[in-house]
Amino acid sequence: MSGARPGTIAITMAGMGSRFTKAGYTCPKYEIEVLGRPLFDWSLCGLNAFRDAGWDFAFATRREETATPFLTQRCATLGITMGPVIELDGVTDGQATTALYLAEQSDQDAPFAVFNIDTFVAPDLLRPEAIDRDLHGWVPCFDAPGDGWSFARTDERGNVVEMREKVRISTHATIGFYWFESARGYRDLYRRHFADGAGVEKGERYIAPMYNSMIAAGGLVRILDVPFAQVGMLGTPEQVAAFAAAPPPGARATLG
């Protein structure tokens, strides 16, 4: 299977975290401790199967946060193979662009995936060997309420035919993990999708809609259904408080 070959997971953690700052937090969001562990650990434990399969983890951070010592220590503790760390001087025009910087530093012919730093997924639900050999894209999704997500619409065969940002075209809301056949493919897709300023939505360059350009070119994209109860959102102070008060079963299981 294509997905079983080790590649690079790009962790985009270069946002401002302004909601946490306004709530009184003084450290970067990913360092905030919940149930005895930093949010960084809670987010990355959902990728244990990729870690065990030998994938590298690359990171995009903000230079002013001097995150490298923290990353080095946490990756060593978690058994993660640490790849490049890119320090950005400011925010980019979207996650797609932040991930592009990491794609440029990755093995161009190996699989490439992007994940955020504010979502918990129960360990072992996301597995590289579950990605079929013929796929060009793979997007884990869950049935989440509301329209504040990216959404994937599938046909009767289960193939993705459309992806939209914060437009509820289906019940398949993405969890924020985006897999691509290769880093080179991600870079080429980025250039095509955002050529001449096209593809920018509300001033931002999102990853999910990039799959529409992949599909239009004949690429095959499928989703993975993830149980809603096994996902915990960590993107806002309110979500973190809810996670601490009632962690998903997969999170409770890791606490022993």
Each model region followed by its residue ranges:
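Short alpha-helical oligomerization interface
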Residues: 27-29
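Conserved core of the sugar-phosphate nucleotidyltransferase
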Residues: 121-197
